[in-house]
A protein has these predicted regions:
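Jelly-roll (double-stranded beta-helix
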Residues: 1-59, 64-85, 93-174
Length: 174
């Protein structure tokens, strides 16, 4: 199999910019044997936190984003400014919040056999965990959507047992 040659990332982004918007927002630049190399654009409006067993590398190319993480039982905002890099450790619940006109490079390791991904939601008022679901990731489009539908379609799951707040579904970003 021929080895993919270097290419100009800025040119690639400009040629694919129309695809770096909702509802998908990301495109694979390399789908290699061990790594997934994605270019991700904003805006997004997700409220879930993603959990996986591998590290994720962020390089923010255009604009600033915030990666919300759960650290020592607290919600923490990690700003990543244009030109900055950030290596997220494995097994850290995280939610990258991307504004309009932002573009970043995200690299993550492909899942090993038996590894699981998870989606978690935390109360926006008191940070109590509302719901979590773990699964072996086979198809990100269908599996994530199924979990989203289960969570957002059930007000009991969205209601905080600690403070009674009800999480509303995220606004749709077009």
């Amino acid at each position: 199999m021929p080895i993919q040659r270097p290419f100009n990332l800025n040119q690639w982004i400009n040629e694919h910019r129309h695809l770096l918007k909702p509802p998908v927002g990301n495109q694979c630049a390399y789908d290699a044997e061990d790594f997934i190399v994605m270019v991700v654009g904003g805006p997004n409006s997700r409220k879930d936190y993603h959990w996986d067993e591998g590290e994720e590398f962020f390089y923010q190319l255009e604009g600033d984003i915030t990666v919300k993480i759960q650290e020592d039982g607290k919600a923490v905002d990690v700003p990543i400014r244009e030109g900055e890099i950030f290596l997220l450790p494995p097994r850290v619940p995280h939610n990258p919040v991307r504004g309009a006109n932002t573009v970043g490079l995200v690299i993550e390791r492909k899942r090993r056999n038996g590894e699981v991904d998870g989606l978690l939601w935390f109360c926006e008022n008191c940070n109590e965990k509302l719901y979590e679901e773990y699964f072996v990731l086979e198809d990100i489009t269908t599996q994530f959507q199924g979990v989203f539908k289960r969570f957002y379609g059930n007000e009991d799951l969205r209601t905080c047992k600690n403070c009674g707040s009800v999480m509303s579904p995220p606004s749709i970003v077009n």
